[in-house]
């Protein structure tokens, strides 16, 4: 599901919500979540899952084209862990 599909589904499910308002709400939620991760905060949405940052240490990688060794710097990457309720719902549905 894309962001625009999510906005369309919200507008369809809640007729009192104009598509423009649904668009604004989704953008504000995603912006708030992004800002929290940039600050290093953990985001927990009960029943859905949590977002946190994982540290990836520096390593030596390989250029797949030439095979030469390449230094890959350390970095922080966003990580999502599905909550128990979400895992169970997906498992039952599939």
UniProtKB/Swiss-Prot annotation:
Annotated keywords: DNA recombination, DNA-binding, Transcription, Transcription regulation, Translation regulation
Classification via CDD domains: IHF_B
Species per Swiss-Prot/TrEMBL record: Dechloromonas aromatica (strain RCB)
UniProt keyword DNA-binding, yes or no: yes
Record has Transcription as a keyword: yes
Tree of life domain: Bacteria
Matching SMART domains: BHL
GO annotation, cellular component aspect: chromosome; cytosol
UniProt-listed Pfam families: Bac_DNA_binding
PANTHER family attached to this UniProt entry: DNA-BINDING PROTEIN HU, INTEGRATION HOST FACTOR SUBUNIT BETA
Parts of the chain that traverse the membrane: none
InterPro entries: Hist_DNA-bd, IHF-like_DNA-bd_dom_sf, IHF_beta
Protein name per UniProt: Integration host factor subunit beta
Complex and partners: Heterodimer of an alpha and a beta chain.
Species classification: Bacteria, Pseudomonadati, Pseudomonadota, Betaproteobacteria, Rhodocyclales
Gene Ontology annotations of biological process type: DNA recombination; regulation of DNA-templated transcription; regulation of translation
Gene Ontology terms, MF aspect: DNA binding; structural constituent of chromatin
Family: Belongs to the bacterial histone-like protein family.
Function recorded in the entry: This protein is one of the two subunits of integration host factor, a specific DNA-binding protein that functions in genetic recombination as well as in transcriptional and translational control.
